[in-house]
């Protein structure tokens, strides 16, 4: 047992020393581009598992007859949010002028290269997973209380306007970033945006509001 402990400690020490020496080594721009892009893709895949978790959580909150509808709603939401965020949302989030509020409503094109340090498509993939997670928060909150097509319309608005604007305030270099605000994992930009969006929908609920009937 003691020998195994010493072996593990030795391996950990060797890894720490090698990682430190590797960090001190100057990496080429191409190498930084590859590793940074790979990091975005891996992070995006991990965040994507949140969507599966949200779907299972939401399915457990509803009656058995609604489970298939919930699954279809989550799959459709994922597709709609990805497409809309690609066309409009990404450029709107990162096109914010320094200290500004709203970016550019234009179709995004990837102009990244080795000098930028990462692929624009990898960052888009990573951020898209956060968009889907934000929409999933609202989806779970309105489970069995909203029709599927009105929710898809809401998901498109969320991915194309609501979330990108709030995201641009901090991650896009907007007024929150200029004020020193930091959000590393989306506690405000993702969860806060989803919660506020739901409360806005809830505040406008009426007996005649078709979105909430059936």
Please describe what each predicted stretch is.
Residues 1-24:
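N-terminal secretory/membrane targeting signals
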Residues 11-13, 77-91, 157-162:
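Hydrophobic alpha-helical membrane-insertion segments
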Residues 24-50, 54, 111:
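Hydrophobic alpha-helical membrane-interaction elements
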Residues 35-43, 65-79:
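Loop-to-helix transition at the N-terminal end of transmembrane alpha-helices
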Residues 53-68, 129-149, 166-175:
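Membrane-water interface regions at transmembrane-helix termini and the short interhelical loops
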Residues 86-104, 144-145, 166-177:
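Transmembrane alpha-helix boundary signature
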Residues 87-137:
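Membrane-interface helix-loop-helix modules in multi-pass inner-membrane proteins
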Residues 199-206:
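Conserved small/polar residues in nucleotide/adenosyl-binding loops
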């Amino acid at each position: 047992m003691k020998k195994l402990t010493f072996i593990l400690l030795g391996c950990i020490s060797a890894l720490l020393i090698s990682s430190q020496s590797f960090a001190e080594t100057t990496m080429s721009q191409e190498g930084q581009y590859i590793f940074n892009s790979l990091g975005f893709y891996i992070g995006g895949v991990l965040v994507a598992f949140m969507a599966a978790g949200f779907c299972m959580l939401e399915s457990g909150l509803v009656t058995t007859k609604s489970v298939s509808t919930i699954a279809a709603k989550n799959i459709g939401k994922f597709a709609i949010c990805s497409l809309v965020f690609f066309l409009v949302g990404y450029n709107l989030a990162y096109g914010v002028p320094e200290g500004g509020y709203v970016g550019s409503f234009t179709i995004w094109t990837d102009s990244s290269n080795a000098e930028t340090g990462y692929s624009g498509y990898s960052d888009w993939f990573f951020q898209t997973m956060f968009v889907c997670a934000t929409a999933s928060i609202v989806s779970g909150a309105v489970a069995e209380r909203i029709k599927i097509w009105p929710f898809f319309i809401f998901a498109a608005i969320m991915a194309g306007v609501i979330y990108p604007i709030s995201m641009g305030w901090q991650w896009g270099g907007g007024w929150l970033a200029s004020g020193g605000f930091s959000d590393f994992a989306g506690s405000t930009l993702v969860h806060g945006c989803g919660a506020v969006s739901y409360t806005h929908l809830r505040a406008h609920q009426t007996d005649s509001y078709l979105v909430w009937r059936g």
